[in-house]
């Protein structure tokens, strides 16, 4: 009995150690991994982790602004946590993968605010990174707009819009409240 208990304790400690080692790191192994890591870091207000999602040693001012704006946006909502619903590829070619992420911001009152975001992801040295805004050409931007238009007809997107509308009906004036926090 004692050996079984000891083995159980060792197993639990091993699981805790392995889980702790994997927590909080940004995965650069897949386009979706870097996007999920970026959103989780934003929800936690982790500026440095968000910066690590970009490949540049020196981040452009646009990328820094995007990071700080995203953190400010999440803070305006009073985010406690983020629940990722789905994350996948909208389109891909040899230069980039266009990734969507559908997630809910868990608010202080335990309600979940539906969100959807898209990111362009590139591969560099066999790792995936977000495109900095300054790296996105007009050609890429135009193609992404066409791809997004198609994405808007998918079940993922229509489910998001329905969830968003339900949230707003339950919380009239919510958008104005957030806009006031962001502009004030």
Where are these regions (language model features)?
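Low-complexity, intrinsically disordered terminal/linker segments enriched in charged
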Residues: 130-184
């Amino acid at each position: 009995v004692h050996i079984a208990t000891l083995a159980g304790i060792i197993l639990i400690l091993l699981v805790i150690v392995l889980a702790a080692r994997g927590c909080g790191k940004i995965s650069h192994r897949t386009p979706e991994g870097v996007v999920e890591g970026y959103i989780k870091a934003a929800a936690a207000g982790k500026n440095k982790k968000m910066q690590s999602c970009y490949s540049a040693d020196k981040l452009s001012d646009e990328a820094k602004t995007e990071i700080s704006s995203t953190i400010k946006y999440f803070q305006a909502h009073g985010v406690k946590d983020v629940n990722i619903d789905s994350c996948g590829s909208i389109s891909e070619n040899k230069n980039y993968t266009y990734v969507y992420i559908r997630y809910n911001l868990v608010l202080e009152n335990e309600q979940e605010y539906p969100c959807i975001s898209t990111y362009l992801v590139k591969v560099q040295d066999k790792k995936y990174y977000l495109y900095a805004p300054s790296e996105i050409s007009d050609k890429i931007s135009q193609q992404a707009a066409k791809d997004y238009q198609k994405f808007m007809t998918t079940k993922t997107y229509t489910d998001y819009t329905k969830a968003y509308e339900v949230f707003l009906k339950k919380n009239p004036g919510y958008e104005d409240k957030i806009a006031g926090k962001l502009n004030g």
